[in-house]
């Protein structure tokens, strides 16, 4: 088994029940992962988690799911403990969780700010910290951020600002974990064609993005397709091992950096 192949590896995906996380779980299992552990936030996602577990198991891989609100004290550490208890080891850790808010700075409350930084910054930091403790040597650690890190746009100050911290966490962790052969990176998708994006947008904004293909000659809708992100994730946690400390914007040229 190659050190950097997905074959035979154990994977943990936070936010792995549906949307991008669920598709990553299915894809890595199809490409040879031995065990896939998915996390989901609340009981409302339990049906999605079960569907993803079934899809993963159909590939021949083992699959486990754990529900947790990762913003609660100790929840991220507990997730890693449960993963190791279930799978025995951990080779690849991927954090896809996040929360988006579209609101002018003047209208953003302290509660809004705290909620955004709790999930997008604090949980992301804790995930990197715990992954660093528990990943096997030559492991892979990947965070999902946002292409807004390369955008000049209003209204997403707390979302993009909270995700911006993860870019530095990624650089720092790559230096600290590099001696063990662990690569640490982040991927920033463009606005994706999922409820995560649409839930924050007014109909006019959705229509604009759907007609904005001219902004990216590779896009048919102006939005990033989830299917287009998954191969980049797979690459970063396998053959892309020589890349580390990087935040890669994957959006068909929607924004650049």
Identify what each model region corresponds to:
Residues 178, 183, 243-245:
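Short, small/polar-rich loop/turn modules that mediate ligand/substrate recognition or access, typified
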Residues 140-165, 170-179, 191-192:
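Catalytic loop of short-chain dehydrogenase/reductase
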Residues 33-49:
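Conserved glycine-rich Rossmann-like NAD(P)H-binding loop of the short-chain dehydrogenase/reductase
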Residues 3-37:
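Canonical Rossmann dinucleotide-binding motif of NAD(H)/NADP(H)-dependent dehydrogenases/reductases
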Residues 179, 204-228:
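Catalytic Tyr-x(3-8)-Lys segment
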Residues 88, 128, 134, 222-250, ...:
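C-terminal substrate-recognition "lid" of short-chain dehydrogenase/reductases
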Residues 104-105, 112-117, 209-214:
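Substrate-binding pocket helix/loop in short-chain dehydrogenase/reductase
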């Amino acid at each position: 088994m190659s050190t950097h192949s997905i074959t035979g590896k154990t994977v943990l995906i936070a936010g792995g029940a549906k949307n991008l996380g669920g598709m990553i779980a299915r894809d890595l299992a199809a490409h040879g992962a031995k065990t896939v552990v998915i996390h989901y936030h609340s009981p409302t996602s339990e049906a999605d988690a079960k569907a993803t577990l079934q899809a993963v198991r159909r590939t021949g891989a083992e699959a486990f799911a754990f529900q947790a609100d990762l913003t609660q004290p100790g929840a991220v550490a507990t997730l890693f403990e449960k993963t190791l208890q279930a799978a025995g080891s951990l080779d690849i850790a991927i954090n896809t969780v996040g929360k988006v808010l579209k609101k002018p700075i003047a209208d953003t409350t302290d509660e809004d700010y705290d909620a955004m930084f709790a999930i997008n910054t604090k949980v992301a930091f804790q995930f990197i910290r715990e992954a660093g403790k528990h990943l096997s040597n030559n492991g892979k650690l990947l965070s999902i951020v946002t292409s807004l890190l390369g955008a000049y746009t209003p209204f997403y100050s707390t979302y993009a600002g909270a995700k911006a911290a993860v870019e530095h966490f990624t650089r720092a962790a790559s230096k600290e974990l590099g001696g063990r052969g662990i690569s640490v990176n982040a991927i920033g998708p463009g606005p994706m064609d999922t409820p995560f994006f649409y839930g924050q947008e007014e109909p006019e904004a959705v229509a604009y993005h759907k007609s904005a293909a001219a902004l990216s000659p590779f896009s048919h809708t102006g939005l990033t397709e989830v299917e287009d992100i998954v191969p980049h994730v797979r690459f970063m946690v396998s053959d892309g091992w020589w890349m580390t400390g990087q935040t890669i914007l994957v959006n068909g040229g929607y924004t650049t950096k």
